[in-house]
Amino acid sequence: MLASTVTGAPLQEQGRAKVNLTLRVVGRRVDGYHDLESVVAFADCADQLTLVPGPELTLTTTGPLAAACGETSDNLVLKAARLLAESVPGLKLGAFELEKVLPVAAGIGGGSADAAAALRLLARLNGLSLDDPRLQAVALKTGADVPVCVPSRACTMTGVGENLQPLALPVLPCVMINPRVPVATKDVFQALGLKPGDLLVGVTDVLTAPSWPTAGASIGDWVSALDQVKNDLEPPALKVQPIIGTVLDALRASHGVLLARMSGSGATCFAIYGSEADAKAAGAQISADHPEWWVHAGTLS
């Protein structure tokens, strides 16, 4: 799908939080990367990225969690933009402004979502399709979670993150919690302890993986299916940061909860509820009990 814009007019995109409803680590490849199988959804909380077209590529960061972003030069927004400029001759660029509201190093792909938002903005500015193979290659080169964040739609994700298949996911009422403790993905995979060439999921497990509900399925149908597949990174993440267990306990003790687990490599955890009212009530109670935590009550889709 092609899009165009008036040069000079500010453009905006959201970097929506990515949530791994399931996450299986199939194994570690000989090149060191991990093969994954994941059901991914996106939340209704997001960073905001603005692009003002201009001659120079820059990035400024604002918002309540701007300080957690670290050095601007290392930001994935700039990495994605530079890689796309290398791949597309004459690419029009400009000044990015990132309003950062999502926790960093949190297992919800905040940096990847921001990079994907940058690619969507540059695609709009330059009349590129999001299916352009150059853009898709840049997304994967920027980071394993960036390809799934480009469309930001519910899907299954396999390989190192490059193989995507859309899913007909209903709107899932949810609460997301981050204890404001960063967890480095590399530390969690190190705690998992797979050597190159090792398998964690056997062939039989792969063949017996559940088929996901189709269009029209209920929240209950999805919870039943999701309950059959765990997050393989949850046990090693608990070793790296035990407070994740406290977060999960709080979610599992909340009224109306149907399923609670960790997203990605943590430390963010989420719970699914039968209604938005239950989710909002649970979020309010947990916020009152733990004012030091980042808590979002909303939906996944």
From Swiss-Prot:
The active site is at 18, 145. Keywords: ATP-binding, Isoprene biosynthesis, Kinase, Nucleotide-binding, Transferase. GO terms for biological process: isopentenyl diphosphate biosynthetic process, methylerythritol 4-phosphate pathway; terpenoid biosynthetic process. ATP binds at residues 103-113. Gene3D superfamilies: 3.30.230.10, GHMP kinase, C-terminal domain. SUPFAM superfamilies: GHMP Kinase, C-terminal domain, Ribosomal protein S5 domain 2-like. It comes from the Bacteria. NCBIfam families: ispE, PRK14608.1. Catalyzes the phosphorylation of the position 2 hydroxy group of 4-diphosphocytidyl-2C-methyl-D-erythritol. PANTHER family: 4-DIPHOSPHOCYTIDYL-2-C-METHYL-D-ERYTHRITOL KINASE, CHLOROPLASTIC (PTHR43527:SF2). This is 4-diphosphocytidyl-2-C-methyl-D-erythritol kinase. It comes from Bradyrhizobium sp. (strain BTAi1 / ATCC BAA-1182).
